[in-house]
Amino acid sequence: MSEPKAIDPKLSTTDRVVKAVPFPPSHRLTAKEVFDNDGKPRVDILKAHLMKEGRLEESVALRIITEGASILRQEKNLLDIDAPVTVCGDIHGQFFDLMKLFEVGGSPANTRYLFLGDYVDRGYFSIECVLYLWALKILYPKTLFLLRGNHECRHLTEYFTFKQECKIKYSERVYDACMDAFDCLPLAALMNQQFLCVHGGLSPEINTLDDIRKLDRFKEPPAYGPMCDILWSDPLEDFGNEKTQEHFTHNTVRGCSYFYSYPAVCEFLQHNNLLSILRAHEAQDAGYRMYRKSQTTGFPSLITIFSAPNYLDVYNNKAAVLKYENNVMNIRQFNCSPHPYWLPNFMDVFTWSLPFVGEKVTEMLVNVLNICSDDELGSEEDGFDGATAAARKEVIRNKIRAIGKMARVFSVLREESESVLTLKGLTPTGMLPSGVLSGGKQTLQSATVEAIEADEAIKGFSPQHKITSFEEAKGLDRINERMPPRRDAMPSDANLNSINKALTSETNGTDSNGSNSSNIQ
């Protein structure tokens, strides 16, 4: 019979258990490592370090952000960009997919790029996207261009994840520097004198390209007006087959700005001698969407590009970039890349494990308190009169019930932690409805977003349900597409009606019959 194997005294409790997952580098890159002798960033070193989840010294991060901002500040509201060019849509903090984008679209060293905004929020690697793109902007200021998206603002980054990410990975100083840099981003680009490129779309207050050039962009985007519309507006869902002749209608999905119609786009294109509008702002199952062709040019009047594959890790969509060269437009699609895992909302492992500890502690407390029987309680209270003794006994019972209720809450948190996080992720505040945890497992499983936002209910949703389609994911995430509440006043319906009447009186009565196009001829 063999002797039991002795425990290796050299076994370290600090060694990484799963060695296949490398530990992020603890060393933060210095200015000497990131910048060469000419002050230009070494983007290859930066890329390799960021892909390992490495970080920079705070002063280095601030230098990249501020130097990039100084270049952006010198650019015009409306950029003039020549072909060939590769146009990219939303990134949303998906840094590892951004690296795949550059593989598909071509190296920034010899490829002209135009990004349409939304570099941050929702994904867990937003600051990496900003640092890398800003470093590329410093290195290639004349061939890499960045526009502003609706998420490049204080209001949304505080509401969603970017501010929290900056504070966890760097500091609030880095976040504030990013906000100042976002204020410098141009609003639009005129590509090859043929295409207007923006993040969202048109505005009833923008009739010519000069209207864009005249805007004051160096500020936090307002809740309404032309700057807001450029960043927030969307085409109508039935674009090209509208049942109304109105050019602009209130955007009920976003809670701000407008939906614009096919006649509105065609009139704008004809008035400004343009071929099409390129925009981002909306997730697409195929990574892109081409809308109804213009009757005068035969070219799609509107094209949407979305460059974040498997958006939020649940949409299961493809991403795409648009390459335009020699008057030929090609769409290149790509799928998502593996990325490191973060607990939801940047939760640390101690917070994650707290329900397990809490359940056991409360369970022990309940067991200790339940050792005392009713007879023992009665014998200890012989010195009190009947009313006082009964009151004391009821107080003790209530305390036991309260701890028992707390034990149930921790039990639910432990058993249903994934369900809790799923539900929190579907609410704009990241908070659960009151009473869900104390109601137990059944209450949690039947909880819906309707309990949090009645007007945006997703009826019948259960965390155990697996999302199986792009449309289902988009529907569940719909509440997060809205502009968060803010104090700015919105224009009245009367103003909107007067705008539409003026536009309708000027239109040439464009025929609204036709079908959407998915190919360019």
UniProtKB/Swiss-Prot annotation:
One cellular component term from this protein's GO annotations in UniProt: cytosol
Site feature location: Interaction with PxVP motif in substrate: 352
Catalytic reaction annotation: O-phospho-L-seryl-[protein] + H2O = L-seryl-[protein] + phosphate; O-phospho-L-threonyl-[protein] + H2O = L-threonyl-[protein] + phosphate
Modification Phosphoserine occurs at: 469, 492
Effect on the protein of changing residue 288 to N/A: Loss of Ca(2+)-mediated transcription factor NFAT activation
Record: disease: Epileptic encephalopathy, infantile or early childhood, 1: A form of epileptic encephalopathy, a heterogeneous group of severe childhood onset epilepsies characterized by refractory seizures, neurodevelopmental impairment, and poor prognosis. Development is normal prior to seizure onset, after which cognitive and motor delays become apparent. IECEE1 is an autosomal dominant condition with onset of seizures between the first weeks and first years of life.
Subunit: Forms a complex composed of a calmodulin-dependent catalytic subunit (also known as calcineurin A) and a regulatory Ca(2+)-binding subunit (also known as calcineurin B). There are three catalytic subunits, each encoded by a separate gene (PPP3CA, PPP3CB, and PPP3CC) and two regulatory subunits which are also encoded by separate genes (PPP3R1 and PPP3R2). In response to an increase in Ca(2+) intracellular levels, forms a complex composed of PPP3CA/calcineurin A, calcineurin B and calmodulin. Interacts (via calcineurin B binding domain) with regulatory subunit PPP3R1/calcineurin B.
Name this polypeptide is given: Protein phosphatase 3 catalytic subunit alpha
